Amino acid sequence: MTLDKTNRMNYLIDFYQELLTPKQRNYMSLYYLDDFSLGEIADEFEVSRQAVYDNIKRTEAMLEQYEERLGLFAKYEQRKLLLDQLKQLDLPSEAHVTIAALEQLE
């Protein structure tokens, strides 16, 4: 698994975790955030490794569908890019205070 995919999944989990079931949330959190192996998750929940794998793959697909429809991560990336561009401009100090406040909201 590539670092880019892991980072993307971490963001998608952050944005859409409330749309997941508790079991999906647990599996994804352990796999992506806590770096558990499929076997470790299977042992933790007393299920087969294949069951964990299937659940994670289905949940990844769901998260990608949520992102395709809602676009929260894409919008976040666009805002971050625009804020970075604003910081590079020669603006009055009051504008930089406002930019910093906007960054705190992210």
From Swiss-Prot:
S-S pairs: none
A Pfam family of this chain: UPF0122
InterPro entries (alphabetical): RNA_pol_sigma_r3/r4-like, UPF0122, UPF0122_fam_protein, WH-like_DNA-bd_sf
SUPFAM superfamilies listed in its UniProt record: Sigma3 and sigma4 domains of RNA polymerase sigma factors
Taxonomy, superkingdom: Bacteria
Role played: Might take part in the signal recognition particle (SRP) pathway. This is inferred from the conservation of its genetic proximity to ftsY/ffh. May be a regulatory protein.
Family per record: Belongs to the UPF0122 family.
Name this polypeptide is given: UPF0122 protein Exig_1902
Source organism of the structure: Exiguobacterium sibiricum (strain DSM 17290 / CCUG 55495 / CIP 109462 / JCM 13490 / 255-15)
